[in-house]
Amino acid sequence: MSKVSRDTLYEAVKEVQAGSRRKKRKFLETVELQISLKNYDPQKDKRFSGTVRLKTTPRPKFSVCVLGDQQHCDEAKAAELPHMDIEALKKLNKNKKLVKKLAKKYDAFLASESLIKQIPRILGPGLNKAGKFPSLLTHNENLGTKVDEVKSTIKFQMKKVLCLAVAVGHVKMSEEELVYNIHLAVNFLVSLLKKNWQNVRALYIKSTMGKPQRLY
């Protein structure tokens, strides 16, 4: 069970939301979970990574582009989703700058089965380097559902430093939605750690421009 009590969570969420109401921003502030680790050696210990799906999409403006076969491109077009077919990808001609630009333009990619294996050959390693290699899109999945799933999935990835941060929501979400998302994210993260809570030095949540609120 989580070492963060529900009361602590609710208090922190209230503070973050109140802070954002006091100082209105011209953009929707993201709420981030910041994690500081201890007893971990990024050089020796296995660097973990894992993804967890949250209940409510943390970033409504998160953009997903479909790299699709004919059917998926038609479905994407009907759903007004950005999409590219194999010909459009070939036109990028493995140009590093253009692939980098594509990786920057969207937050995530979905690719049809027939395309996904060809992506390294057509585009080179650009999407992978940007940490945006496409998720697989099959024909027995509903495109809209799959896009929602990608939008509400967050990734924990341990790099060379002992701190990491992930988006768990935004300030316009309800208290319950934020608390639920944070609870899911914290429990999942702790399950990835070798010694669970013994590896956690501190946990904070903060909005983009707000003050950090300590959870643990």
UniProtKB/Swiss-Prot annotation:
Q: Which GO terms describe its cellular component?
A: cytosolic large ribosomal subunit
Keywords, A to Z, come to:
Cytoplasm, Ribonucleoprotein, Ribosomal protein
Give me any GO biological process, just one: chordate embryonic development
Instruction: Please verify whether the record's keywords include Ribonucleoprotein.
Output: yes
Where exactly are the transmembrane stretches of this chain? none
Q: Give disulfide pairs as residue numbers.
A: none
Q: How does it assemble?
A: Component of the large ribosomal subunit.
- State its role: Component of the large ribosomal subunit. The ribosome is a large ribonucleoprotein complex responsible for the synthesis of proteins in the cell.
Q: What is this protein called?
A: Large ribosomal subunit protein uL1
